[in-house]
């Protein structure tokens, strides 16, 4: 008599090993195969195994050429050449497998907020592990661009620390006489609300405002910022950090960055360390410094230096993350028109690894964004099945009559660095 062993009869350890080899982009299809597979993916012990990378492996999500990729960097010591493995393109934003172009992406504990490159700059929150999405349409989109051809909106994804309900912060706040507008989207109410904010700071400021990406930590988002004043010197005053608290829906005070002064040609960017700490990178062409927080709250912060290396590198983006155990920083950028990671050790050693093919940044520039990634069990709350709540007459007046009208009037008379595309307003 012939005995046949089915998948369901295999030992749990063997099933774990099989599923651990499934590429991130294929997890949704495998989970839909049967209830047993789905249950195994939901099991937290499996999640821990999946999150535990191989020796020397750093797993990440990378935005390259307006597409998202799952990627691993293998690094086993400064004396050994590093290598990269592209684990697959993440392509399930549309059910019909139509690939979309992504202009920006923001990370919050396994969830990704993607800003799409379409005529409305649609927003979608995505959990690649579950394959879940939630599409959100902005109320209005200004088509004014900065000198790098990027729209002047700033986004952040966070959550209420009491209810764990997710929210999206969106604002436009240019330099000098440009009107500002801060608004927040609540996943529970499915509504946008204008915030009462009179900023005493600049977050989206020239010349590198288009690169000032916020970092979300424990539900709140942090940015580098400068104090708002009429005679601001854009090149020397970047010496603060500011936090937006998604629970209170308020900004905290400006808090000092650990280095002395930001000088012309320098770059300052933020990163998250194991969802526990913030890190800040300071590069002034000749020196690279990385600092890590030892204490962080919405209104208090303290720092400890992680490493200092004398090296010349001309960074535009400076997306980075660090490995505290190996004492290295991985800095991602596009020098000489090629996506590259610099692996910098505390002893001053530097390894350089190319990730993709050369690109023509003059014709087709796309930012290189990287974040460390661990699959998340968080379910994205979907809009209520009943009729959507109506926004109040006060909010409608604040949105239409005040903010949108001001932006339209400003667009008709103002061009930022000579770049302007007619605006589109969502029908209301």
Swiss-Prot record:
InterPro entries: F-box-assoc_dom_typ1, F-box-assoc_interact_dom, F-box-like_dom_sf, F-box_dom, Gal_Oxase/kelch_b-propeller, SCF_F-box_component
SMART domains: FBOX (SM00256)
Entry-linked Pfam families: F-box (PF00646), FBA_1 (PF07734)
Top-rank lineage group of the source organism: Eukaryota
Entries under PANTHER family matching the protein: BNACNNG10540D PROTEIN (PTHR31672), F-BOX PROTEIN CPR30-LIKE (PTHR31672:SF13)
SUPFAM superfamilies in UniProt: F-box domain (SSF81383), Galactose oxidase, central domain (SSF50965)
Organism whose genome encodes this protein: Arabidopsis thaliana (Mouse-ear cress)
Protein's UniProt name: Putative F-box protein At3g22421
């Amino acid at each position: 008599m012939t005995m046949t062993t089915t998948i369901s009869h295999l030992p749990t350890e063997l099933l774990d090993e099989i599923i651990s080899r499934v590429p991130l982009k294929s997890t949704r299809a495998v989970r839909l195969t049967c209830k047993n597979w789905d249950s195994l993916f939901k099991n937290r012990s499996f999640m821990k195994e999946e999150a535990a990378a191989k020796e020397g492996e750093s797993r990440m999500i990378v935005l390259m050429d307006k597409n998202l990729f799952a990627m691993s960097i293998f690094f086993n010591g400064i004396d050994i050449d590093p290598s990269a493995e592209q684990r697959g393109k993440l392509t399930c934003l549309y059910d019909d497998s139509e690939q979309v172009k992504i202009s920006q992406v923001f990370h919050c504990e396994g969830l990704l907020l993607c800003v799409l490159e379409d005529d409305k700059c649609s927003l979608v929150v995505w959990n690649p592990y579950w394959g879940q999405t939630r599409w959100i349409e902005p109320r209005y989109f200004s088509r004014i661009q900065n000198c790098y051809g990027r729209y002047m909106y700033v986004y952040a994804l966070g959550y209420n620390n009491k209810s764990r309900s997710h929210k999206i912060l969106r604002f436009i706040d240019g330099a000098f006489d440009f009107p500002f507008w801060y608004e927040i989207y609540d996943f529970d109410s499915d509504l946008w609300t204008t915030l009462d904010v009179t900023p005493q700071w600049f977050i989206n400021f020239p010349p590198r405002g288009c690169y000032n990406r916020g970092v979300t930590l424990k539900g709140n988002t942090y940015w580098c910022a400068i104090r708002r004043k009429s005679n601001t010197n854009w090149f020397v005053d970047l010496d603060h950090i500011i936090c937006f608290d998604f629970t209170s829906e308020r900004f905290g005070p400006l808090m000092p960055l650990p280095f002395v002064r930001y000088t012309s040609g320098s770059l300052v960017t933020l990163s998250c360390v194991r969802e526990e700490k913030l890190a800040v990178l300071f590069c002034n062409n000749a020196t690279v410094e990385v600092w890590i927080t030892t204490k962080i709250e919405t209104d208090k912060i303290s720092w400890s230096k992680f490493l200092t290396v004398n090296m010349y590198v001309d960074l535009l983006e400076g997306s980075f993350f660090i490995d505290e155990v190996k004492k290295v920083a991985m800095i991602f950028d596009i020098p000489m028109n090629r996506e590259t990671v610099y692996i910098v050790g505390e002893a001053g050693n530097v390894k350089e690894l190319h990730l993709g093919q050369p690109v023509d940044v003059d014709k087709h520039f796309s930012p290189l964004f990287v974040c460390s990634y661990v699959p998340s069990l968080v379910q994205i709350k979907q809009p209520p099945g009943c009729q959507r709540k109506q926004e109040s007459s006060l909010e409608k007046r604040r949105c239409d009559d005040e903010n949108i009208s001001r932006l339209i009037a400003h667009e008709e008379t103002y061009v930022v660095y000579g770049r302007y595309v007619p605006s589109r307003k969502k029908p209301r």
